[in-house]
């Protein structure tokens, strides 16, 4: 079964990604440190969920950008 994240976790992760896009990576451990540094989270569980969704969101965004670049390249050849 997949993970279901609350809107709050998604919102915080997306805001972090937009603000610190250059620092966010697809590495979960690095993203945990970023969440610790920039978000005042009371529990470790919430921090980990934000970092996990942030990692997943970063992977999705990078894949989407990569696909767009490939499509532009293919259209340019034709």
From Swiss-Prot:
This is Small ribosomal subunit protein eS17. One of its GO terms (cellular component) is cytosol. Keywords: Ribonucleoprotein, Ribosomal protein. GO terms for biological process: translation. Pfam families: Ribosomal_S17e. GO terms for molecular function: structural constituent of ribosome. InterPro entries: Ribosomal_eS17, Ribosomal_eS17_CS, Ribosomal_eS17_sf. It comes from Sulfurisphaera tokodaii (strain DSM 16993 / JCM 10545 / NBRC 100140 / 7) (Sulfolobus tokodaii). The keyword Ribonucleoprotein applies. It comes from the Archaea. Belongs to the eukaryotic ribosomal protein eS17 family.
């Amino acid at each position: 079964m997949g993970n279901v994240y609350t809107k709050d976790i998604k919102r915080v992760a997306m805001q972090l990604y937009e603000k610190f896009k250059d620092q966010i990576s697809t590495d979960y451990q690095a993203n945990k440190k970023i969440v610790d540094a920039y978000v005042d989270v009371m529990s470790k569980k919430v921090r980990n969920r934000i970092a996990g969704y942030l990692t997943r969101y970063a992977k999705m965004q990078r894949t989407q950008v990569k696909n767009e670049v490939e499509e532009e390249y293919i259209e340019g050849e034709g």
